[in-house]
């Protein structure tokens, strides 16, 4: 037991409120962590002893880290906004501390929080803004009690769409996917979440218009979310024919089939890379948008409502650089960056899915919808933040004793320094 106590990592709990106290209780018998005290911004709590732990001000942090060999800080502030959390992270990162966080306040108050709920800081915290809250009426409008089909249902966007959809109580959910394993995986996940909903898995190529029309007619589909696409810029650049076939022809087939079988709503998932495209992927998605708008113009008397949604980069999606950066940091670096000034817009996968659903409820005339994602993010700053949040220091000319190096490798063919969301007033 003495040896085990020596191997424990010393931690501080940031937040001496209900969440922090619940966490200290949960950590009492932890074989891995030993609580040294609380940190809190409330002056009235400083120097008080709660549950046997002293409450310290942030001004004492440097001394605490040095004298107690602190490894981690657990954020027990589940109700604070993202800006405040970012400010706290910046302060903690000065001391090379690994920051971990907790789930919602309701789970803590209800006593449902356990030591296993402690996790690494959420990747969503990389956004320099709070998450955009959805309109509940819009979420329900085209889904509740209706038959929904999602193409690319096994992908990162498609699967999150499905997770959001099943919460809105559709009549049926059809999962259309060409990748067998991806289809199996999302089907298994969704059937566990909702055992009562009729979920149908369809191993189908979205370019097959005849098969699509059969499906739309057989199941009387009300709403289609077209998420199937190839998204990796460099791969599509090297596989132009397949990229165009999958991204453009599938949109044509879906749009024609939707009109022919009187589907009520069709939503195309597009990208900010479709704006003044400089690569094949962006061009293929812009062409997909034009196909949707062209088919709408040709079939104005149709009962099918078309809408288009443009995304920025979705955090932790299959096409995002974030998982790659995380892997490089975990392996000790270097983290590769194409250009020191490259910027991107970012959104969470939840925001992305909710935007798609709301756009489908608002769209009628093949309008293009975009999410207000605030200011674009400088990728170099994002990498530095990720390195710091992981408990490491950036190694550069100013700090040769740092842990992780950032290596500039040059822009890839077709890659922009910055993205736009709209072309003029389109």
Regions found by a protein language model. Give the residues of each.
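Flexible, Lys/Arg-rich cytosolic regulatory linkers and terminal tails that connect or flank
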Residues: 46, 53, 58, 85-147, ...
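Conserved Rossmann-fold cofactor-binding substructure of NAD(P)-dependent oxidoreductases
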Residues: 203-223
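Conserved Rossmann-fold NAD(P)-dependent oxidoreductase catalytic core, especially the SDR/UDP-sugar
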Residues: 110-111, 226, 230-289
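Mid/C-terminal beta-alpha module of Rossmann-like enzyme folds, strongest
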Residues: 362-426
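A conserved pocket-lining segment of Rossmann-fold NAD(P)-dependent short-chain dehydrogenase/reductase
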Residues: 301, 324-347, 351, 355-379
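N-terminal Rossmann NAD(P)H-binding glycine-rich loop of SDR-like oxidoreductase domains
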Residues: 148-166
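A solvent-exposed beta-alpha-beta segment
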Residues: 2-108, 181-187, 192, 199-200, ...
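Active-site Tyr-X1-5-Lys
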Residues: 253-264, 277-306, 318-331
């Amino acid at each position: 037991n003495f040896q085990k106590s020596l191997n424990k990592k010393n931690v501080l709990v940031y937040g001496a409120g209900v969440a922090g106290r619940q966490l200290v209780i949960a950590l009492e018998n932890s074989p891995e962590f030993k609580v040294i005290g609380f940190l809190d911004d409330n002056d009235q709590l400083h120097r008080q002893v709660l549950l046997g732990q002293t409450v310290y001000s942030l001004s004492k942090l440097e001394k605490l880290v040095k004298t107690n060999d602190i490894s981690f800080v657990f954020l027990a502030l589940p109700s604070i906004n993202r800006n405040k959390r970012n400010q706290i992270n910046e302060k903690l990162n000065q001391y090379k501390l690994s920051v971990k966080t907790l789930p919602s306040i309701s789970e803590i108050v209800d006593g449902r929080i356990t030591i296993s709920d402690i996790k690494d800081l959420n990747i969503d915290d990389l956004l320099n803004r709070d998450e955009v809250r959805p309109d509940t009426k819009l979420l329900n409008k085209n889904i509740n009690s209706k038959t929904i089909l999602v193409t690319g249902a096994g992908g990162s966007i498609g699967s999150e769409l499905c997770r959001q959809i099943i919460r809105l109580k559709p009549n049926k959910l059809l999962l259309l996917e060409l990748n067998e394993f991806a289809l199996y995986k999302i089907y298994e996940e969704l059937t566990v979440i909702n055992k009562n909903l009729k979920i149908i898995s369809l191993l189908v190529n979205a370019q097959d218009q005849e098969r699509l029309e059969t499906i739309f007619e057989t199941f009387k589909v009300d709403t289609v979310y077209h998420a199937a696409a190839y998204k990796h810029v460099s791969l599509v650049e090297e596989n132009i024919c397949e990229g165009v076939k999958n991204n453009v022809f599938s949109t044509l087939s879906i749009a024609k089939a939707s009109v022919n079988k009187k589907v009520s709503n069709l939503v195309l998932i597009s990208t900010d890379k479709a704006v003044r495209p400089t690569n094949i992927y962006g061009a293929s998605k812009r062409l997909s948008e034009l196909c949707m708008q062209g088919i709408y113009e040709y079939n104005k008397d149709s009962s099918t409502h078309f809408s288009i949604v443009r995304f920025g980069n979705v955090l932790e999606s299959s096409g995002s650089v974030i998982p790659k950066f995380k892997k490089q940091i975990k392996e000790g670096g270097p983290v590769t960056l194409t250009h020191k000034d490259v910027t991107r817009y970012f959104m969470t996968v939840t925001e992305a899915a909710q935007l798609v659903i709301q756009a489908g409820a608002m769209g009628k005339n093949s309008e293009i919808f975009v999410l207000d994602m605030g200011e674009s993010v400088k990728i170099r700053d994002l990498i530095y933040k990720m390195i710091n949040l992981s408990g490491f220091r950036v190694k550069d000319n100013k700090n040769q004793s740092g842990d992780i190096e950032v290596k500039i490798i040059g822009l890839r063919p077709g890659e922009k320094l910055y993205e736009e969301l709209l072309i003029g007033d389109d």
